[in-house]
Swiss-Prot record:
Keyword Ribonucleoprotein: yes
Pfam families assigned to the protein according to its UniProt record, in alphabetical order: Ribosomal_L21p
Lineage: Bacteria, Pseudomonadati, Pseudomonadota, Gammaproteobacteria, Enterobacterales
Signal peptide start and end residues: none
Keywords: Ribonucleoprotein, Ribosomal protein, RNA-binding, rRNA-binding
A molecular function (GO) term: structural constituent of ribosome
Protein's job: This protein binds to 23S rRNA in the presence of protein L20.
Family recorded in the similarity comment: Belongs to the bacterial ribosomal protein bL21 family.
Protein name: Large ribosomal subunit protein bL21
Species for this entry: Buchnera aphidicola subsp. Cinara cedri (strain Cc)
Length: 103
């Protein structure tokens, strides 16, 4: 059984026990989180498609870790002008462990 959830305009395919990496959520480690925007559910041979979401399905998860991604470098460059600008960025993330899919 798996489901596709919608979180801040991004879709994630989840199963029970899977750890997904989301953008930063301002909650403490160990807190329970409930996702209510489920757009697809597949159970055994049956599939349920939301129009736009499934109202009676939700997913329970547990905040397991906060962190920052690996640093990426952004470089702007203009040829023959002695212009070069570098910048770095590290995105914050939250790991969520999926406990159960309730339907």
């Amino acid at each position: 059984m798996y489901a596709i959830l919608l979180d801040r305009n991004k879709q994630y395919k989840v199963t029970c026990g899977k750890i997904i990496r989301l953008e930063k959520i301002k909650m403490n480690i160990g807190e329970k989180i409930i996702f209510k925007k489920i757009i697809f559910l597949s159970k055994d041979e049956k599939s349920f498609i939301g129009k736009p979401i499934l109202s009676d399905v939700y997913i329970e998860g547990l905040i397991s870790k906060h962190g920052r991604e690996k640093k990426i470098k952004i470089i702007k460059f203009h040829r023959r002008k002695h212009y070069k600008k570098t910048q770095g960025h590290r995105q914050y993330y939250t790991d969520v462990k999926i406990k159960q899919i309730i339907y």
